[in-house]
Amino acid sequence: MAKSILFGEESRRAMQAGVDKLANAVKVTLGPKGRNVVLDKKFGSPLITNDGVTIAKEIELEDPYENMGAQLVKEVATKTNDVAGDGTTTATLLAQAIIREGLKNVTAGANPMLIRKGIKLAVDTAVEQIKKSSKQVDGKEDIARVAAISAADPEIGKLIADAMERVGNEGVITVEESNTMATELEVVEGMQFDRGYLSPYMVTDAEKMEAVLENPYILLTDKKISNIQEILPILEQIVQQGKKLLIIAEDIEGEALATLVVNKLRGTFTCVAVKAPGFGDRRKEMLRDIAILTGGEVISEELGREIKDVTLDMLGTAESIKVTKENTTIVNGKGSKAEIEDRIGQIKRQIEETTSEFDKEKLQERLAKIAGGVAVVKVGAATETELKERKLRIEDALAATKAAVEEGIVAGGGTAYLRAIKEVEKLTDNNSEIRLGIAIIRRALEEPVRQIASNAGLEGSVIIDKIMNGQEGMGFDALEGEYVNMVQKGIVDPAKVTRSALQNAASVASTFLTTECVVAEIPEKNPAPQAPGMGGMGMEGMY
């Protein structure tokens, strides 16, 4: 495949055109008066969204040089989304501003390597200021504010705050599509795993087709049970106690399953059997989680334990257990608080150490199940188009909320960046080109407020001047068109989102400025298909 090469100013300008096309498409969504972007889909209805990263991912440009520029800025949005889950529009906007200001200076003959140094110095200072000015999230109200600003909807803010309150910071909150028009919150208290009863004859409520066991014993094993003689000794002890039993095993089949079902139907003894959750090593760990939560032991040959030797003190207990066709929920396991805390700490350490995203996700699920619970936000809307748009906004709001809990909140509406300018202005250096890098960031930090104002139909420069000369904490509420104390008014952003957007934008933009040559593939031209021959039409002497 032949390649095309561009050098110097020409290469940077070609890539900048791509950066501008992508950034201009994304930045119209910024702020409370930002608009939506409609994305064409090959299948189904178009997607309407104001989510920066979703828009960026859809953009592919025909010109290979422009496309390279667009892909670089796309990385800014994607990385910010991965780290903080929100702030992708701000990150794209900042990258565009740094590239625009930087290229002016590089074109005028400044050394891009020294400019890059100045950019890094200014960004580090601004990030430090953002961290210093952040305050910890204090209760449900702060969480609701962060989510409401991110989703541009107070109702969504309230819903997510409720979910966080119910499952705690360690709990898992998922977003699913609802079959109704209403958006609702569904919370699963206790530990739930996706395994249901092995036989429908085990249900205690035939109408709802579920088995509910109050204060039952729980037998946990990683073995397959097929011989009833293995579990007969422990069954006899439980019958004498007048209790019910939940068996969680690799499988229960044949004679053992048939005997349990017959005894249940006769009313002699209630026992529900379910398969153990997970696979391989993950199954062993999940059984251990359940054992710690319920105060029982896992009966495993690896540990030298046989099912026939099980005693009552090896069984777990819980306040209640609900088993449906697909799920088992254990509520209020009677395990030791200290052991549960140790297990939570152990899983947290594993999350920090693992490099696999898949493992991290699975560990996070296990942590939620043992620590808090699972909340499901069921998103409803009148049409599929609105549903998709709403779901994206809720996912962003959820990510913003988690980021706020991690690193606290700062004044929203781009105000935190303006406050950081004062610290950046204090920086100085003997080298004039490093000073240029600092000045580029100083100018770029104004860009979010400019764009929010522009999307609201106002002049950004006037607003920036007023905020910079105003009291500490003052910012511009673009929705109401007034100057207010941003934190008191509840216009806040997560510090992690604000910080990540700036760091990722500067990282890609400063590398962009050091480009001196661009190599792209020349697209192959497909030869035009030849016209089919017209047999039998030839005439003598004619070709």
Curated annotation (Swiss-Prot):
Q: Which UniProt keywords apply?
A: ATP-binding, Chaperone, Cytoplasm, Isomerase, Nucleotide-binding
> Which Enzyme Commission numbers does its entry carry?
5.6.1.7
Q: What class of enzyme is it?
A: isomerase
Q: Which domain of life is it from?
A: Bacteria
**CDD domains named in the record:** GroEL
Predominant localisation class: cytoplasm
On whether Transmembrane helix is a keyword of this UniProt record, the answer is no
> What family classification does the UniProt entry report for this protein?
Belongs to the chaperonin (HSP60) family.
- Is-annotated flag, keyword DNA damage? no
A Gene Ontology cellular component where this protein is annotated is: cytoplasm
BP terms from Gene Ontology: protein refolding
Q: What is the scientific name of the source organism?
A: Clostridium botulinum
Compartmental location: Cytoplasm
The residues that hold ATP are T29, L30, G31, P32, D86, G87, T88, T89, T90, G413, D477, A478, L479, D493
- MF term (GO), any: ATP-dependent protein folding chaperone
Q: Could you tell me what this protein does?
A: Together with its co-chaperonin GroES, plays an essential role in assisting protein folding. The GroEL-GroES system forms a nano-cage that allows encapsulation of the non-native substrate proteins and provides a physical environment optimized to promote and accelerate protein folding.
Per its record, how is this protein called by name?
Chaperonin GroEL
Q: Which reaction does it catalyse?
A: ATP + H2O + a folded polypeptide = ADP + phosphate + an unfolded polypeptide
Quaternary structure and partners: Forms a cylinder of 14 subunits composed of two heptameric rings stacked back-to-back. Interacts with the co-chaperonin GroES.
